[in-house]
Swiss-Prot record:
Topaquinone (TPQ) is generated by copper-dependent autoxidation of a specific tyrosyl residue. This is Phenylethylamine oxidase. Belongs to the copper/topaquinone oxidase family. It comes from Arthrobacter globiformis. Catalyzes the oxidative deamination of phenylethylamine to phenylacetaldehyde with the concomitant production of hydrogen peroxide and ammonia. Its EC number is 1.4.3.21. Cu cation binds at H431, H433, H592. Changing Y382F: Loss of activity. The active site is at D298, Y382. Homodimer. Binds 1 copper ion per subunit. Contains 1 topaquinone per subunit. GO terms for biological process: amine metabolic process. Residues 1-2 form a propeptide. GO terms for molecular function: copper ion binding; primary methylamine oxidase activity; quinone binding.
Length: 638
């Protein structure tokens, strides 16, 4: 395990505790922080395009909520100069609300514990109020005119029989409450009738469920006697097997990768300027009036980085691990370290290349390895792993790992078209997990374009008498209006991001190819609220011209925003994207019909995408990878 010390050389360094304290002090001095104020977001602003570190102005962006009901503010602070650069009041009825605060979770449960309508509904179900837990959930935007401009959370109830009990096993169905967390008012309680509360417990560490633990697993020991092959300098700058990058962390997006480049001979060649998972939404497919509003933007409404786990060696990460411990702000502007929040290691990844040639007699084998940069976050019932992989051959991959406990409901006696049955009387509504990767591309610089590639079956006839021929079709996407695209597994559709001004030795533009997983996009009706609010999730690919203030696919303020912000507003400008400074936004996700095997705790399910070199190099970039020593002491074929 290698410790990392955060230094202050790079403009892409992680935020330090000292800097966050400085921001807090600047805000207090300016009268922007006080007893009624809460920080809903605080993050480092990326340096402006082309800005050098010698002229750096270290700036932070801050969203400030007022619990008394005064208008929130978006503030920009310069730590370098010790000043507030701007402070803008927000009309939340138009802009949307700031992200959900953790203290508001408690507000919902406390208010409902004394609400007569809520207590009456619990009494009708013969439930002990002291055992009822409430999941406070982002509200979305629906037909309730009275909610406009109000900060609303909705609450669903679960029974927790004892402190260690998994309350998700005991949903209280037919009941939901709407709460204004600013005015401290329960605005609605909807009770559609009593459903039996599932009684069977879901305590996944209880011997009653686990049975005798396995004794068949032998130890797997991963060691690197000489240490890992990567180096960490300046606190977060990584060099590994010709790769160079800066690892950042944002309380909203989690891990952010900056300045991803590959050393090709004596050139350090840029590939991606900034890569992040800029949004994730979990839309549910149950039309019941109790749950038809369930659509959570885990990134924009809850902030995935805020709930990042402290990772443990041998549990979350295995091998020779280097950790980074990012520092974020709490709601009062105090620095909070997420100890070992980012895990970095390299791992063997099977065969890289192999051939046994009958003519030359050469037997060739090279082993692959990859660099892994990851973090895990817990958002309510679900846990998500965000894993970035770099490979020896220049491939970049992202993988999301979904696990945790599925969100539960009662299972209707007559069955359901929208809910799976997990256990007697226990259901789990169908849902999706949809992510948006924001890829600020820089293939050999910022002059880039995107081509869509499809396989084409050639018709049998003259020139193709045996009907065996197939080809490919490439279409250049020239404007933003043309670059809102759908994946197509039938044609093997991919997208090539290239630099028309940089050529390989065959005089072809250098590029990278984006390979999608070809899972369904948003399944909600196009006229639905969630289709307006999560427009990014309706298409697999969006390409926009780069702009400093276009950071998120759903816009800056997602919570209770009615829709239209983010990508729809960006592409409305219909800018030229052919040979320009562009951003590629890739939508990918899981469609989850929960299985009985997903209960009481869900084994990991995965989804992601790959970027592979497409003419970026002049030949295979792994010819210089040496053969591994074999177990017998000699070297593998080669």
């Amino acid at each position: 395990m290698t410790p990392s010390t955060i230094q202050t050389a790079s403009p892409f360094r992680l935020a330090s505790a000292g800097e966050i304290s400085e921001v807090q002090g600047i805000l207090r001095t300016a009268g922007l922080l006080g007893p009624e104020k809460r920080i809903a977001y605080l993050g480092v602003l990326d340096p402006a395009r082309g800005a050098g570190s010698e002229a750096e102005d270290r700036r932070f962006r801050v969203f400030i909520h007022d619990v008394s009901g005064a208008r929130p503010q978006e503030v920009t602070v310069s730590v370098t100069n010790g000043t507030v650069i701007s402070a803008v009041e927000l009309d939340t009825a138009a802009t949307g609300e700031l992200p959900v605060l953790e203290e508001e979770f408690e507000v919902v449960e406390q208010l409902l514990a004394t609400d007569e309508r809520w207590l009456k509904a619990l009494a009708a179900r013969n439930l002990d109020v002291s055992k009822v837990r409430v999941a406070p959930l982002s509200a979305g935007v629906f037909e309730y005119a009275e909610e406009r401009g109000r900060r609303i959370l909705r609450g669903l109830a679960f029974v927790q029989d004892f402190p260690e009990d998994s309350a998700w096993a005991h949903p209280v169905d037919g009941l939901v409450a709407y709460v204004d967390v600013v005015s401290k008012e329960v605005t609605r309680v909807i009770d559609t009738g009593v459903f039996p509360v599932p009684a069977e417990h879901g305590n996944y560490t209880d011997p009653e469920l686990t049975g005798p633990l396995r004794t068949t697993q032998k130890p797997i020991s991963i060691t690197q006697p000489e240490g890992p092959s990567f180096t960490v300098t300046g606190g977060n700058h990584i060099e590994w097997e010709k790769w160079s990058l800066d690892v950042g962390f944002d309380v909203r997006e989690g891990v952010v990768l900056h300045n991803i480049a590959f050393r090709d001979g004596d050139r350090l060649r840029p590939i991606i300027n900034r890569a992040s998972i800029a949004e994730m939404v979990v839309p549910y497919g149950d039309p019941s009036p109790i749950r038809s509003w369930q659509n959570y933007f885990d990134t924009g409404e809850y902030l995935v980085g805020q709930y990042a786990n402290s990772l443990e060696l041998g549990c979350d990460c295995l091998g020779d691990i280097t950790y980074l411990s990012p520092v974020i702000s709490d709601a009062f502007g105090n620095p909070r370290e997420i100890r070992n929040g980012i895990c970095m290691h390299e791992e063997d990844w099977g065969i890289l290349a192999k051939h046994s040639d009958l003519w030359s007699g050469i037997n060739y084998t090279r082993r692959n390895r990859r660099m892994v940069i990851s973090f895990f976050t817990t958002i309510g019932n679900y846990d998500y792993g965000f894993y970035w992989y770099l490979y020896l051959d220049g491939t970049i991959e992202f993988e999301a790992k979904a696990t945790g406990v599925v969100f539960t409901s009662a299972f209707p006696e007559g069955g359901s078209d929208n809910i799976s049955q997990l256990a007697p009387g226990l259901g789990a509504p169908f849902h999706q997990h949809i992510f948006s990767a924001r890829l600020d591309m820089a293939i050999d610089g910022f002059t880039n374009r995107v081509e869509e590639e499809d396989v084409v079956r050639q018709t049998m006839g003259p020139g193709n008498e045996r009907g065996n021929a197939f080809s490919r079709k490439r279409t250049v996407l020239t404007r933003e209006s043309e670059a809102v695209r759908e994946a197509d597994a039938r044609t093997g559709r991919t997208w090539i991001i290239s630099n028309p001004e940089s050529k390989n030795r065959l005089n072809e533009p250098v590029g990278y190819k984006l390979h999608a997983h070809n899972q369904p996009t948003l399944l909600a009706d196009p006229g639905s609220s969630i289709a307006r609010r999560a427009a990014f999730a309706t298409k697999d690919l969006w390409v926009t011209r780069y702009a400093d203030d276009e950071r998120y696919p759903t816009g800056d303020f997602v919570n209770q925003h009615s829709g239209g912000a983010g990508l729809p507003s960006y592409i409305a400008q219909d800018r030229d994207i052919d040979g320009q400074d562009i951003v590629v936004w890739h939508t990918f996700g899981l469609t989850h019909f929960p299985r009985v095997e997903d209960w009481p705790i869900m084994p990991v399910d995965t989804v992601g995408f790959k970027l592979r070199p497409e003419g970026f190099f002049d030949r295979s970039p792994v010819l210089d990878v040496p053969a591994n020593p074999s177990q017998s002491g000699s070297h593998c074929h080669g």
